[in-house]
């Protein structure tokens, strides 16, 4: 009986997939792309990541931390057969690390230094399943935006240009390259995180990339503000009653002016995925009941910005 059990377990280990933690790899050919292909890539990523049973006011929500699969892989294919694979947490789309083909038939993995414990082991074995060809080159800094900005040598990521050509070029500076600086790595990560994870979370950021598809551009104040308030926006939409937020949400528009959001339909066009929030939420609401709120919101924003205008006098 014992011998049969050992044989059964051995066969299972041989036949089992290398990693049961990651969903199918989403592949995006950065080196040969179009606006339509970029949009399809982001939709594929959203569909792989979202919890199909969770939705608030028609906006899909990501799963909680206990839901399997736990991770999503995104393979970015650059020019000249250069590739980099990002590993994302499925529940929030945070980039945990990445891998690239290295030397002859080797897989080199890079992990942020704020990823620890079993998660760190998961990143290593998921990105590079074959232990015999695995090579480590750790990221010597954490994944927070302030750290990435500092390592990239800028005060704000608004100074780091985004764009398809820039992402393609940055892949070439990392993939298979023996040695590169922390600045080069941080610049690549700032661009990749915003054009993959942030664009998957926000339609507004996706549209910024599509509008500037054939040229480099600097992210505007609204882009940065959305990135920093995704959790707050998700909670506000989840807790809204008949489309009205529980309290005014103070955001920033593209020009940097205050933007006060009172209703779900004001922010909904900008949001593609909600961060996970526990508990039930409304899936739809009565549009006709929102007209008084529309008037109130217009008046509220007018008075707020009028107050800012006279503040300097």
Curated annotation (Swiss-Prot):
Substrate binds at residues 95, 143, 197, 201. Disulfide bonds join 56-281, 107-128. GO terms for biological process: defense response to virus; negative regulation of translation. The active site is at residues 94, 145, 198, 201. Keywords: Antiviral defense, Disulfide bond, Hydrolase, Plant defense, Protein synthesis inhibitor, Signal, Toxin. Residues 286-313 form a propeptide. GO terms for molecular function: rRNA N-glycosylase activity; toxin activity. It catalyses: Endohydrolysis of the N-glycosidic bond at one specific adenosine on the 28S rRNA. It comes from the Eukaryota. The keyword Protein biosynthesis does not apply. Residues 1-22 form the signal peptide. Expressed in spring leaves (at protein level). Expressed in roots (at protein level). It holds the Pfam family RIP. InterPro entries: Ribosome-inact_prot_sf, Ribosome_inactivat_1/2, Ribosome_inactivat_prot, Ribosome_inactivat_prot_CS, Ribosome_inactivat_prot_sub1, Ribosome_inactivat_prot_sub2, Shiga-like_toxin_subunit_A. Its EC number is 3.2.2.22. Monomer. Belongs to the ribosome-inactivating protein family. Type 1 RIP subfamily. Possesses antiviral potency. Inhibits viral infection of plants (tobacco mosaic virus). Inhibits protein synthesis. Releases both adenine and guanine from Escherichia coli rRNA in vitro. Activity on guanine is 20 times slower than that on adenine. Depurinates genomic RNA of immunodeficiency virus type-I (HIV-I) and bacteriophage (MS 2) RNA. Inhibits the replication of HIV-1 in human peripheral blood mononuclear cells with IC(50) value of 14 nM. This is Antiviral protein I. It comes from Phytolacca americana (American pokeweed). The gene is PAP1.
């Amino acid at each position: 009986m014992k011998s049969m059990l050992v044989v059964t377990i051995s066969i299972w280990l041989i036949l089992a997939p290398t990693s049961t933690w990651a969903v199918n790899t989403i592949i995006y050919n950065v080196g040969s792309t179009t606006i339509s292909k970029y949009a399809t890539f982001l939709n594929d990523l959203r569909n792989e990541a979202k919890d199909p049973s969770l939705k608030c006011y028609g906006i899909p929500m990501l799963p909680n931390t206990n839901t399997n699969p736990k991770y999503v892989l995104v393979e970015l294919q650059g020019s000249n057969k250069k590739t980099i694979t990002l590993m994302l947490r499925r529940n929030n789309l945070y980039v945990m690390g990445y891998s690239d083909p290295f030397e002859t038939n080797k897989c080199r993995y890079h992990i942020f230094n704020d990823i620890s414990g079993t998660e760190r082991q998961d990143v290593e074995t998921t990105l590079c399943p074959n232990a015999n060809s695995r090579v480590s080159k750790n990221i010597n800094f954490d994944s927070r935006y302030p750290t990435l900005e500092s390592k990239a040598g800028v005060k704000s990521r608004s100074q780091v240009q985004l764009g398809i050509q820039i992402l393609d070029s940055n892949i070439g500076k990392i993939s298979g390259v023996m040695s590169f600086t922390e600045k080069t790595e941080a610049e690549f990560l700032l661009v990749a995180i915003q054009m993959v994870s942030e664009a998957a979370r926000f339609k507004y950021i996706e549209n910024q990339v599509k509008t500037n598809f054939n040229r480099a551009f600097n992210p505007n104040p609204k882009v940065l503000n959305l990135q920093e308030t995704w959790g707050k926006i998700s909670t506000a939409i989840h807790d809204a009653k008949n489309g009205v937020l529980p309290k005014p949400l103070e955001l920033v528009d593209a020009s940097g002016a205050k933007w006060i959001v009172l209703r779900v339909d004001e922010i909904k066009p900008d949001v593609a995925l909600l961060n996970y929030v526990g508990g039930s939420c409304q899936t739809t609401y009565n549009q006709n009941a929102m007209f008084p709120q529309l008037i109130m919101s217009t008046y509220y924003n007018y008075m707020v910005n009028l107050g800012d205008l006279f503040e300097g006098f």
